[in-house]
Amino acid sequence: MTNPFLNLTYEPALESLGNEFFDPVSAATFPEHKLRFRNDRLLPMLGLEPSQVKDDNFVEAFGLFHGVRPFLALRYHGYQFGEYNPNLGDGRGFLYGQVRGVNGELFDFGTKGSGQTPYSRGGDGRLTLKGGVREVLAAEALHRLGVKTSRCLSLVETGDSLWRGDEPSPTRASVMIRFSRSHIRFGTFERLHYHHQTEQIAQLLDHVIVTYYPEVSGSNSDDSAHIAFFRVLVERVAKLVAQWMAAGFCHGVLNTDNMSITGESFDYGPYGFVPTYDLNFIAAYFDYGGRYRFGNQPAVCRWNLERLQVSLSSVIPSKAMTEALEDYEKIYLGYYITLIARRLGISSTLGDRLDPELWEKLVGQTLQCLAQSQWSYPDFFAQLRLNFSPSWRDNADLILENVDLLGADWSTWRSIYQQVLKQLPPESLAAVPTVLEQANPLTDLLRPRIETVWQAIAEDDNWQPFNDLVQKLQSGN
């Protein structure tokens, strides 16, 4: 039987731009190939029926790396913790291939942990198994929370033993396939700007617009398309950060080389979900100054856009980009309020019917109470989903009556929430439970849960807790 992955039509979209953007590389060979995760939910997007794709097909394509060539290690630079670093590039992965989904969109298969490249900088090019497990879990959790994100297509344990300073060593190794819209980063353009490659900047930008920004690719002139692209990118990034903040997600390392040009979450290795609403929460243990703390994500992503503005200034008028950036905070705040309101059961379609000041007041009071009380951030929204009753509209004292509301002015919050519910027409009030269910998963992905899953794997090679958690994260239960 032929391998469905090897029969896909791979497009040389990025490869066709020329070898200025990548280096051809080979995959490492591994002593073992154990499939630990396969994401059957992604297969229909590729026109594949999960029942027709065997585990061995995943291993052959994404563990043994048979059948597809060339593999491309992409070149890029980046600002890391605010300092420019020209010594970057794909150091432990490559672009495996690009395929069209059934919806006509182009998707990347990118590896992580597939061996050394010219950009490994002395590293072994490998991925720890724990790192792979963590990314699988985060991607599925973010997707269920409605956050635009890359996903993991497969995770193969390789049998290698790795030494890491931040993990008990030796530790197990893996190779992962990341499924995303693109692996072109802000840092891809920054590298071209650093080398004064104006023609290549224009070439890559036109490729990005045609491939990932069809809504602006039909503009009457290159200038108008380029300006429109940057405006849409600013909007995408602002909304993405709003999604992170509403989800309680801290990326961890928002260097410009970890920012996708499509406005999609990826490369969030040291991520963390906030246990409580704490703007000073830091996900990465090495973020000593708190540059990438939870509450600083909106500001640092705007800073990253400003760095990209410099790199694109040879192609896009700087004034036009500055004007686009002036809308960043407004877009972010408006979308963030909408998302928090949704987590409170109020859908965006109802927003036009509500008093906007009351809506903002509810969101503000909610966040203030969560910060003061230090109630578990995911548990608060889960309790709303589990306990909501239409009777709350008529009696504020009934709102979360079975939950101890301590440590903050919850009585004021109850009063405001009741006022909002009173504004809803009957059909909208009836829809609140559905909105709450869609917006608020019952299973969190806080660090203790991840560590429990990992300990079962590390100590007993027991993958059942991991599989159970993936299923819960995907379903929202």
Swiss-Prot record:
Keyword field: ATP-binding, Magnesium, Manganese, Metal-binding, Nucleotide-binding, Nucleotidyltransferase, Transferase
Entry cofactors: Mg(2+); Mn(2+)
Active-site residues (renumbered): D257 (proton acceptor)
EC numbers on record: 2.7.7.-, 2.7.7.108
The keyword Nuclease is assigned to this record: no
Binding site residues for ATP: G89, G91, R92, K112, D124, G125, R178, R185, D267
Record: residues binding Mg(2+): N258, D267
Catalytic activity: L-seryl-[protein] + ATP = 3-O-(5'-adenylyl)-L-seryl-[protein] + diphosphate; L-threonyl-[protein] + ATP = 3-O-(5'-adenylyl)-L-threonyl-[protein] + diphosphate; L-tyrosyl-[protein] + ATP = O-(5'-adenylyl)-L-tyrosyl-[protein] + diphosphate; L-histidyl-[protein] + UTP = N(tele)-(5'-uridylyl)-L-histidyl-[protein] + diphosphate
Keyword Transferase applies: yes
Pfam families assigned to the protein according to its UniProt record, in alphabetical order: SelO
InterPro entries documented for this protein: SelO (IPR003846)
Protein family: Belongs to the SELO family.
Role this protein plays: Nucleotidyltransferase involved in the post-translational modification of proteins. It can catalyze the addition of adenosine monophosphate (AMP) or uridine monophosphate (UMP) to a protein, resulting in modifications known as AMPylation and UMPylation.
Protein name: Protein nucleotidyltransferase YdiU
